[in-house]
């Protein structure tokens, strides 16, 4: 099995509950997207950020390291599943790890463990999905490029839940706590009060 070299950060949402673009929220005076991509560049040779449109891309271009590839949604308005579709059509390898832009606490241990899971399971799984007490973490998962057609079929039927994708393909479940014993990698910031850490 080849190495997992691609990672895509999904950042196309409007952040309605938060009241602003979540990738631009600050932690220690740095935007979430800068924190996340800086960490990812230490582990992956192909780092992508998927944004909703060219206006958002213009804003992010001034923040991101030049090694980060910026993509805009090929299927605007399709939510995270549309971002997965876009990224899978542009990755350099056979699969990519996906992360949301509102998870700046992702750990090195999580990234190393996901790459190891891909080495062990990538040939036999269409997706490698962390599973916690509350169920799947489908936006912290590895998806094979071979599921892009399934994503397109789901979107053509107006099925936009990423959970529907993992139910439709051969998904391997991995205990989230085994990937990151602190579970900090899975901590999302959805509302202003979540920023009080």
UniProtKB/Swiss-Prot annotation:
GO BP, sorted A to Z: Mo-molybdopterin cofactor biosynthetic process
Q: Which residues bind GTP?
A: 10-12, 22, 73, 102
Alphabetized UniProt keyword annotations: Cytoplasm, GTP-binding, Magnesium, Metal-binding, Molybdenum cofactor biosynthesis, Nucleotide-binding, Transferase
Main localization category: cytoplasm
User: Where does this protein hold Mg(2+)?
Assistant: 102
| Enzyme nomenclature, EC number | 2.7.7.77
Q: Does the keyword GTP-binding apply?
A: yes
Q: Which domain of life is it from?
A: Archaea
UniProt lists the family membership as follows:
Belongs to the MobA family.
Biological source species: Methanothermobacter thermautotrophicus (strain ATCC 29096 / DSM 1053 / JCM 10044 / NBRC 100330 / Delta H)
Please tell me which top-level EC class this enzyme sits in.
Answer: transferase
**Compartment(s) of residence:** Cytoplasm
Q: Which reaction does it catalyse?
A: Mo-molybdopterin + GTP + H(+) = Mo-molybdopterin guanine dinucleotide + diphosphate
Q: What is known of its domains?
A: The N-terminal domain determines nucleotide recognition and specific binding, while the C-terminal domain determines the specific binding to the target protein.
Q: Which cofactor does it need?
A: Mg(2+)
**A Gene Ontology term for the protein's cellular component:** cytoplasm
SUPFAM superfamilies cross-referenced by the UniProt entry? Nucleotide-diphospho-sugar transferases (SSF53448)
- Give the protein's recorded name: Probable molybdenum cofactor guanylyltransferase
Q: What does this protein do?
A: Transfers a GMP moiety from GTP to Mo-molybdopterin (Mo-MPT) cofactor (Moco or molybdenum cofactor) to form Mo-molybdopterin guanine dinucleotide (Mo-MGD) cofactor.
Q: Name one GO molecular function term.
A: metal ion binding
């Amino acid at each position: 099995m080849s190495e997992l070299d691609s990672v895509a950060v999904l950042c196309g949402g409007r952040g309605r509950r938060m009241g602003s673009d979540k990738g631009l929220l600050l932690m220690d005076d740095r935007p979430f997207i800068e924190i996340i991509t800086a960490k990812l560049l230490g582990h992956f040779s192909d780092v992508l950020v998927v944004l909703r449109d060219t206006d958002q891309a213009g804003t992010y271009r001034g923040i991101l390291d030049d090694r980060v590839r910026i993509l805009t949604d090929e299927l605007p308005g399709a939510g995270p599943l549309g971002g997965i579709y876009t990224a899978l059509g542009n990755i350099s390898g056979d699969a990519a790890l996906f992360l949301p832009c509102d998870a700046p606490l992702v750990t090195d241990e999580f990234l190393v463990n996901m790459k190891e899971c891909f080495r062990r399971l990538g040939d036999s799984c269409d997706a490698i999905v962390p599973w916690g007490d509350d169920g799947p973490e489908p936006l912290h998962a590895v998806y094979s490029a071979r599921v892009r057609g399934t994503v397109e079929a789901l979107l053509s039927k107006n099925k936009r839940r990423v959970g529907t994708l993992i139910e439709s393909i051969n998904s391997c479940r991995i205990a989230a706590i085994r990937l990151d014993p602190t579970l900090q990698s899975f901590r999302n910031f959805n509302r202003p009060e979540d920023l009080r850490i």
